[in-house]
């Protein structure tokens, strides 16, 4: 079974891209091997993203999301590190600026 963290952020997509790039440099063993970070989808740009469902999912959790990215578990033996990954992302983006949903369903 695939495990993904759906990460919605109220920060601008370009800001999030920069922060995620920094995280991959700071934690190469974590984000280059055990977990994979997807590209950042700009939910505010209708030419690059037209799925309003993602915006609605975030709104259901009181988040006005500007962007979305996924963190996929690449190494099944690293599943116990999910709370660590969540904490790193929340710390980097600001806890109030990010909504993390386990498989796009369960709030973390």
PLM features per residue range, with description:
Residues 17-20, 35, 81, 85:
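Generic alpha-helix signal with a bias toward terminal, lower-confidence helices
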Residues 29-37, 96-103:
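Conserved short beta-strand edge segments in small beta-sheet-based binding/regulatory domains
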Residues 44-108:
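Charged interaction segments
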